[in-house]
Amino acid sequence: VRKIIIPALILGILVLPVWGEIPSPEESLGFQVGADRKLADWQQIVRYFRELEQNSDRVLVQELGRTSQDNPFLLVVISHPDTLANLAGFQKIQEMLADPRKIEGDFQEFIEQGKTIVLTTCAIHSTEVASAQMSMEFAYDLARGEDPETEEILKNVIFLLVPSLNPDGVNMVNHWYQQTLGTPAEGESPPQLYHPYAGHDNNRDWYMLTQKETRLVVEKIHNVWHPQIVVDMHEMSAYGARMFVPPFMDPIDPNVDPILQAQIVSLGGSLFSAFIAAGKKGIVTQAIYDAYTPARAYQHYHGGVRILLETARARLATPIYLNKGELRSGDNYNVHRPSWNFPVPWEGGVWRLRDIVEYQKIGLRAALLHGARYRKAWLENFYRVGVASIQRSQPYAFVLPPEQRDSQSLYDLLEVLDFGKVEIQRAQEPFQVRSSTVVSAPLGLPNRREFPAGSYVILMQQPYGAFAKTLLEIQHYPGSREYPGGPFRRPFDVTAQTLGIQLGVETYQVMQPFEASLNEVDEVQVPSGQIEGEGIYGLFSHTDNAFARLVNRLFKQNRAVFWAPNGFSAEGASFPVGTLLVHFDEGEIAAQQLLEDIPLKVQLVKKRPELAWQQIRMPRIGLYKSFSSAIDEGWTRWILEGYEFPYQSLNDQDIREADLSEYDVILFPHQEPTKIEQGLGDSYPEQYRGGLGKEGMARLRQFASEGGTLVFLGEASRLPLLRWQLGGVDITDRLTSREFSVPGALLRVSVNNHHPIGYGMMEEAAVMFWHTPAFDLSRGLSVVHYSSKDPLLSGWIHGEEHLVGKTALAEIPMDQGRVILIGFRTQFRAQTRGTYKFLFNSLYYATTE
């Protein structure tokens, strides 16, 4: 059935469209949404929404772009037909309310005309299958409903529905589920990341904004529609409460406006009441989840609330049965005992996909009703949050000097702010401030009063100043214990995000107003590199992450590249250890062609400096890819591709059977050692079962003994210590959480920057410590170690005394080869760009003689 368009002019009369009968999801799919063992794939979901659009004047479907795997990314807009006819006008109202500086006169006229914008995002985590399915039935109900509640929603709300934030994953999980129906693997997660690069971390990308899907949503929904309410649909453990609704547990990021914090309580309470009134059991609030990190909540810093609806999962679309004794309590509630925040326990029984769909529909409808009934309050508070932001008194600004050790990371940081709609100014002349505080690594830099022309200035008196502030300031996480004398309560995610520290970008916080000649930066663009001097030998710095991209481009032209094992002078200039050298037959012309979008300076000299240059080659990289999927493996692929490293993925069978001499280096991303060794269990098809096993570990040892390099990241670095006699232990293994806890913090380390792995780094750096080993070595070389009794730079730590003197990055010889252990999270979520060089250098180091 499709929308019927009658020719516009019949006998001089304009005739409007006649709408066909609205098809139900069941009619389109051939099964009820939520039926046992039935899932629609992404193509079926897209087809259904197209049918709905063709047959309802309340529904508009927009394709915003394409996903990582080239699937259509949809936004479904649902509202009253009159509203849909004037979407541009309502977007303009939202734009004005989002930035009160644009409103001349009384803001109330915009309140009277505006609608509450409610955005619902489904299925970002693709094994949480219900919400993408539910979205079709929920949209159908709104498209055809004639009841007073539906009319109230349509009149007062513009409902933005994203059926899936990860369409690629919807297909992956669906296809896996269909393949395994009726087998022991039915209901298991697929043996691959369900986002091509980020896996589960695609919901930790809301400030770094790296992935295609994240950027589509931010650029074309958040920054256009400025929603007051964001409802993010998820599923959680099957063994606890049936549904979580906000408010969240403490702490909440103090940069979230108090008005928004109060609205989370109000909205969450309304949903909580709706579930209890509907007779639903197992509803918990103010438990399990906090709201501290911006990695999960873009809208908290852009005028709206982001609430989380977490429903207990089934086994994908397969029902489960749980008896009462199998249920487990969670943080801040007892699953067997009624309490104010968990008034009606669920007693166990069958739990199926349809139950999840029903719970989600109740919660989502309650959110829309709240937005409709309190439309004026939502819009007024949205406006007041903006007013408070542009009236912020302290800090006054953050300043980033233009000359940085790592220009690439400077532009990366500025691009994050710019994409998040933060206004960036640039100083036209030198200026002075009363005082400033450095908020970047190393913290030993002196505070500054004078800044040069070209400095970047981020004033806090702007609509999205909170986004800039939470990303640029140092975090002081308020740690707490589960009970007096008990273990420390673990945050839901990390406790630090300070970008100046993570990226190694010199950043200063200025508390008091100052005068400066500033111009707004229209768009952050990475400039191409510069050529200086004359000659055919090019020298360039190792301090900029972009060095790796240039080196790899040189390798693709079959040019020889060398790095300097010590500092030197050439043509009156000094160059540090690690400086790179390349020979250009064509001189400046050849160099300039390679420097497109690489912000590096290449110094040409006529004569090759005389020292013991060490040649490096394009590393032949084998990247371990476990069927017990490691999120860090996806991030590692994304980074390697972005910096133009060729690599080959290696699974367990490859390592056991392939010719490993084809590789210079085999890289193991962060993953638990047991998952690497043992892999998936017997419920999976045979080709996915098991891990490396003893045979795979023996092959790796042989590879290193014969001259290869093994690089282990994060928790994976515990594996060789456990299985081989390397002369080292992980000291965190023997410490309890009462003695030692670092839940995602940025810590100070000392670096041997005369070792090739440390080239380009300063003597002091910042590393991300999260699920991280620290080494006590009796042999090998410590390249990076924890030297300070006060290592915390941002976040939270307990028991820091245990780290003093321990190794963070080690090189351990193994016969003719080596094992490199990088305990900290050197490329964590593509955020810790200040420590990328440890990874890049390890790969190049594997090619040296």
Question: Where in the sequence are the language-model features?
Answer:
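Substrate-binding cleft of carbohydrate-active enzyme catalytic domains
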Residues: 168-171, 190-200, 209-221, 226
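Bacterial N-terminal signal peptides
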Residues: 7-17
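Positively charged n-region of N-terminal signal peptides that target proteins for export
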Residues: 1-4
